[in-house]
Amino acid sequence: MDLTPATLLPLAWVGYVLGCAAGLLFLRHEKLANLFSFGFATLGALCGTVACVVSLASSATTTAPLQLQLLPTLIPYVQFTISLDPLSAFFGLIVSLLAFALSLYSLGYARGFYGRKNVGVLGAFFNVMLLATTLVVMADNAFFFLMVWEIMALSAYCLVSFEHEKPETRSAGVLYFVMSHIGTGCIMLGFLLLFQATGGYDFAGFHTLSAKPEWLASGSRNAAFLLFLAGFGIKAGIVPLHTWLPAAHPVAPSNVSAFMSGVLIKTGIYGLTRVFFYFLGTPPMWWGVTVLAIGTISAVLGVLYALMQHDLKRLLAYHSIENIGIILMGFGASLMFLNTGHPLLATLALIAGLYHTINHAVFKGLLFLGAGAVLHATHTRDMEQMGGLAKRMPQTAFCFLVGAVAISALPPLNGFVSEWLTYQSLLQGFGSTDSLLRLMFPIGGALLALTSALAAACFVKAFGITFLAQPRSDAAAQAHEVPFTMLLGQGVLVAACVFLGLFPTVFLRVLDPLTQLLTGQQISPLLILANGLVLSGVNQAGGTVSTLGMAVLGVALLFIPLALRLVLGQKTKTRIGPTWDCGLKGLTPRMEYTATGFSKPIRMIFKALFRPRREVQREYDFSPYFATSIRFEAHVEEVFETRIYRPLQRLVLRLSRRMRALQAGSLQAYLIYIFITLLLLLLFAL
C-alpha cells in the first residue's frame, strides 16, 4: 500500500466511523464496545498521525497541497472539500497524535465505567469528536468548516455531560453549550463579512483579500478581526471568555478532558492563525497590541487562579488558560512585527506560538491522563484527600512528573524550548525603533517570567500534595497502579515531550513551508538548526541554547555521586530507619502541608484580586480554651464570573421572563412573527 496522505487520511476517517458504529452496535456489550470503538479509534489516529507527518516532511518539495472532495454537492457556495496545506497538516498532527495516545488510554480507562455507564455511547461520541475535529483543521470551505465545527461542539457537549446524573456536570454542560454557540455565531458573522468582500466561501478566495487595497482600508476588516477573535477566543478559552473551561474540563471523563484541553481548544488557535496570518492581510498595530495584551492577561490570571485550586483537574484547566495566553503572546508579537516591517522577527514570534501549541497539547494531555489515572485509583479529584501515591502508583507518578517539568518550562523538556523562543522574540523589541514595541515587549517578557515562576510553584504543589508524603484518606492508602493501556497512552506523550524537548531542531526544520505560507519567510535565517537553537536576531544579537547538551550534561553530573558512592561506599555503613519526625512520637497526615496552606502566601499577596473569604468553625467541650474540633475553609472570588457573568445571567433571565408573553401558544401569532421577520430581512437586503 502506498503510504501517502491521500491514502492514509481516508483510512483514518474510516477508522473513526467504524469506531462510532462499533460503539452503537455493542451498546449492550460493554467489553466489546470498549475494545472495538477505542480500538478502531487507535488505528484511525495512527493513520492520521503518519499522514500528517508525511505531509509536513514532503511539503518543502510539494508545490500544491493535497485536496480531496469528500462528497459531491449541488448547493451553491458549498464544497465538501479538504485541503492539507502545511498549516492543516501541523494541526492535523496535533489532533491525530493526541487521539492516538488517548484512544490507547481509553481502552483501560473505560473499564471504570463498566456497570455504571454505557461505554458504547462514550466510544461512539468520542469517535465522532475525533473525526469532526480532524475535518475542522482541514476544511477548505466556510460552510463545511461551520458544519464540522458544530458537530465537534455538539459531540463534546454530549461527552462533557456523560455523567449527567451529577448537578455540577449538567450545569457545566449547559454553560459549555451556550458559550460554544455564542462563539459559533461570531465566527459565522465573520465569514459573512468575508463572503461580502469575495463573493464566495472558499478559503482560497478569502486568502486573496490580503492583496486588495480596498479591503485593507475597510472597516469590515476590523469588524471581522474582532468577531473572529471573540468566536475562536471562546473556544480557545482566552480571558475574559474562559468561564466555560474550568467548569467543563473537570467534570468530563478524563480522556475527554485531555482531548478538550490538548486539542479542542487548539481548534480556536487554528482558527486565529488561519484568519490573522492567511485571510486578513497585513495587520494594523492595534491588532497586535490587543492580542498581546489578552495573551498576557490570560497567562497571568490563568496561573494565579490555578494556584488557588485543590481540585486537580480544575487546576489543570486553569493552566490551559495560562498556556493559551502564552501562545497568544507569540501571535501578538508576530502581528506587531509584521506591522512594523520585520517579517523575520514576526516569523520567530509566530514559530514560538505554534511550537508552544503542540508542546501544550502534548504535556497538558499527559497531565490530564495522569489526573485521570489518579481519579481512577482514588475516586476523588480533591488533592487534600490524596498523598503517598508515588509509592502506590510509581509509573503514573513518573509520567505526571515529566508533564509537570515540561509545563514548568524547565530544561531539557519541550515546554522550555517554546517559552525560550517566546522570550527571545519579545527581547527583540528592545532593538526596534518603534516606541510601542520598546514599551510593551519588556512588560510582556517580565510578566511571562512571572507566569513561568508561578507555574513551577503550582506544579511543586500539584505533584507534592498528590504524590508525596503520607496518604490523607483511605482511598489514597488503598490506591493501585492503573491498567497497562492507560500507562501506554501516557508513555506515548512522555516520549513526545522528550523528543520535542531534546530535538526541537528536527521538528522546526520541517516548518519552513508553514512559515513561508503565513509570513512569506522561513525559519532558517533566524535559527541555525544544528546541534542547538542559535538565534541571530537584530544585529546578530540573541541567545544560544541546546537542550540536548543540557540533558547530556545532566546525565554526566549524575555519575559524580555514583562514582563517589563506589569509591567511598565500602567505608560507610548504610542505616535504614523511619523518617525524622522533629522529635515527635510519629508523623501523621495531619502534619503535612495542604494544597490550601501551600498557596496561602500567593493568596495573601494577590488578595485584591482573589478577595479571599475565610470561615472558621470551632467546637468546644466545656470551655472556650478547650476546642474539640476546628474547621477552616477558604474561598476565592473568580472576578469575571462574579462581576460579569452572574449579573449578565440575571439580566438575561429577567428579560426572558418578560418576553415569555410572546409565547402565546397561537399558531396565527407565530406566523405573524415569521412574516414580520421576513419583511425586516427583505428591507435590510435592499
Regions found by a protein language model. Name each.
Residues 1-10, 21-124, 197-215, 575-577:
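Transmembrane helix-loop-helix hairpins at membrane boundaries of multipass inner-membrane proteins
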Residues 2-7, 81-88, 141-143, 211-218, ...:
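Interfacial loop-to-helix junctions that mark the boundaries of transmembrane helices
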Residues 506-556, 564-686:
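Aromatic-capped, Gly/Pro-kinked transmembrane alpha-helices
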Residues 101-145, 157-481:
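Hydrophobic transmembrane alpha-helices and their helix-loop junctions in integral membrane proteins
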Residues 39-56, 181-192, 400-412, 489-513:
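Hydrophobic alpha-helical membrane-insertion segments
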Residues 20-24, 104, 303, 462, ...:
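Alpha-helical transmembrane segments
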Residues 81-96, 216-232, 436-452, 530-559:
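Hydrophobic alpha-helical transmembrane segments
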